[in-house]
């Protein structure tokens, strides 16, 4: 029996490539989401009080920005998203740029290769930053984006300043004991 004209590849031939792609995405999602803290812990009203000294404020801001880094990033990005709802073209541009950042920088395990040459991740970072700032500068939402970033940063800094840090590491130890 001849097999002329039939496709010899089985559907499983694509499995290793697909597994490689999804493995990279899953590792990055896990590492990024692993640092996201529960919103209930972040907004626990019993963990707020006003500090008496400036040194305490600085210490709290440093500790909380490291501990709640992913949550704070989500807050600022949500602020930018809300500011762009009234400017749909800029919102689409921002979403396209976000996709480009994810594809070219964040979800990449190996260096970017163009014409059989590896591009260093710092070069990609610089080029993507320049392109992002240039494109957002050309949209009509410059003021909206600037105000949203400042508002998000003020919300983050005010939360970080009044959120007590004594229970942060205790909670980390408890969760590490539960999940060895």
Swiss-Prot record:
It is a multi-pass membrane protein. It holds the Pfam family PRA1. Keywords: Endosome, Membrane, Transmembrane, Transmembrane helix, Transport. InterPro entries: Prenylated_rab_accept_PRA1. The chain crosses the membrane at residues 63-83, 84-104, 123-143, 145-165. It is found in: Endosome membrane. Signal peptide: none annotated. Expressed in hypocotyls, leaf bases and shoot apex. GO terms for cellular component: endoplasmic reticulum; endosome membrane. One of its GO terms (biological process) is vesicle-mediated transport. Its main location: membrane. The keyword Transmembrane helix applies. It comes from the Eukaryota. Interacts with PRA1F2. PANTHER family: PRA1 FAMILY PROTEIN F1, PRENYLATED RAB ACCEPTOR 1-RELATED. May be involved in both secretory and endocytic intracellular trafficking in the endosomal/prevacuolar compartments. Belongs to the PRA1 family. This is PRA1 family protein F1.
């Amino acid at each position: 029996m001849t097999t002329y004209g039939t496709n010899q590849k089985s559907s499983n031939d694509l499995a290793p490539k697909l597994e490689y792609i999804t493995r990279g995405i899953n590792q990055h999602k896990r590492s990024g989401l692993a640092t996201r803290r529960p919103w209930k812990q972040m907004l626990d009203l019993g963990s707020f009080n006003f500090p008496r000294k400036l040194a305490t404020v600085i210490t709290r801001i440093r500790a909380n920005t490291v501990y709640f880094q992913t949550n704070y990033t989500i807050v600022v990005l949500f602020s930018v998203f809300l500011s762009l709802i009234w400017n749909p073209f800029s919102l689409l541009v921002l979403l396209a740029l976000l996709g480009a950042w994810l594809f070219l920088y964040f979800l990449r395990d190996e260096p970017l290769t163009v014409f059989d040459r590896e591009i260093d991740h710092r070069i990609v970072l610089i080029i993507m930053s320049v392109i992002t700032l240039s494109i957002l500068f050309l949209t009509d939402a410059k003021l909206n984006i600037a105000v949203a970033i400042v508002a998000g940063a003020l919300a983050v800094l005010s939360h970080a300043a009044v959120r007590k840090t004594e229970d942060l590491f205790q909670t980390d130890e408890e969760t590490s004991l539960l999940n060895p």
